[in-house]
Amino acid sequence: MYLISVEGGDGSGKGLATKIVAEILDKEFTFTSVEKTAEPRRDHPLGRLAIDSVKMQSLKPEGEAGLFAADRLDHSHGWILPRLKEGKAVVSERNIHSSLVYQGIVGKLGLERVAHMNSAALVPDLCIWVDCDPKIALKRIEGGTLRNLSDKKEYFETSELQKEIREGYKNLLSGKLDMPTPFDMGALVGPILNETSESDFRKKLTTILKNFLHSKPLPINVKSNDVEIYHLRELLYSLDGQSTLENIGLKKIR
């Protein structure tokens, strides 16, 4: 039903936040299921092309942005949307805001240009912006764990670049820069500082999720009756096809 993205610079704690958010949603709310994902997709050919273009520095920013957009559109409509229609919550480590910052601001393509390239992608219902001091982020990266998970060399090699990325997120997600259409429709919360204990971080994320979900926002990417139709279809199939609703394409199971 809801797509929730977690954004922030490398080493800020996005992976941890994604894990915690999924745990909170699964434990405290009544979604049919909670699924985690990430962009770019390291286990998909389109995602690998995008990652390799950065590692090899083989393309100009526009080419890189095109590969990230292609991966995102396929991910949006081939994987995420079907799950949202089933009433599931999807938590994505990185989504559209990463492209807006990395290619639009840092890569100097411009926000409108990158937004246009991604205009057919899903819009996160909630974006959680995670932040920490760049010095702390670099220590986490240099500790080895993040480097191993990130296939060594990608975007996060220098402290100067870390500062530029952090400033990009700050300018975009704080409202200093206008969020381009259609990605201005979702809710945005942050910065959520991840500089102390995990328990403190968890408390902050729990408060955010409760505030968001208790407000009962309408989903951006699916209609409420999409979820109802899915569950009705499942119910009718479970009754061994004894009922038929032609308007939702059901046939009796013989």
Language-model segments: which ranges?
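Nucleotide donor/acceptor-binding cores
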Residues: 1-2, 32
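Hydrophobic anchor at the beta1->P-loop junction of P-loop NTPases
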Residues: 4-6
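ATP-binding Walker
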Residues: 11-12
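Walker A/P-loop
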Residues: 15
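NTP-dependent small-molecule kinase module
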Residues: 20-22, 135-254
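Post-Walker A helix-loop "phosphate-sensing" segment adjacent to the P-loop in P-loop NTPases
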Residues: 23-34
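ATP-dependent small-molecule kinase phosphotransfer cores
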Residues: 32-119
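Conserved phosphate-donor/acceptor-positioning beta-strand/loop module used by diverse small-molecule
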Residues: 92-95, 120-141
